[in-house]
Every structure is written in C-alpha cells, then in structure tokens.
Amino acid sequence: MSTGNILVVDDEPDIRQIVQEILEDENYAITTAENAVAARAAYNTHRPDLVLLDIWMPDTDGITLLKEWASTGQLTMPVVMMSGHGTIETAVEATR
C-alpha cells in the first residue's frame, strides 16, 4: 500500500532514478518528469501529494513552474525545491 504520491521533476535522469528508488523503498508511489511540459501532464494525471521540483531545467525553470501552479490555483500540495547549483538568491526567489 502506497503512503502517498510524489512527483519528482528533474532534467537529470540519474537524479530522477535515485530519488525514485529511495522513495519507492519507503512505499511511496512515484511519478517522474524530465521537464515542465511533462510535469504539467503528470500533475494533471496523478494529482501528487508532494512535488520535488528541480530549480534549473532547460525549458521552463522550476521557480517559473511553481509560480504558474500558484497563480492558477493548482498549488494544493507542498513543493520541495531542489538544485545542485543553488544560490542564496535562488533560494529566496523560490520562497516568494
């Protein structure tokens, strides 16, 4: 039995895979997306309980996607922003 649905959004396949494996070992149902287009589709299909969202992605960055979800009333779940290239400024922007 799943303990919750988590959407993992990251353009790096290795990151998606390792996060998915770790969370599936804890009985979470995981959906992955490699970019904002796939994340939008996965959100609409699976309605996740939590989103792990990469800040830096090539098409649309995670902060833009987060703001989009907030402005359209779709931000109904917690979102954890992730980045291997973060800065203080980026972290502050993600919290706005």
Q: What residues fall within each predicted segment?
A:
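His-Asp phosphorelay/catalytic-motif detector in bacterial-type signaling
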Residues: 3, 47-49, 73-78
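Short amphipathic alpha-helix used as the core "switch/output" element in two-component signaling
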Residues: 41, 63-75, 93
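The feature encodes the CheY-like receiver
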Residues: 16, 58, 72, 83, ...
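Acidic catalytic/metal-coordinating carboxylates
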Residues: 4, 34-38, 61-64
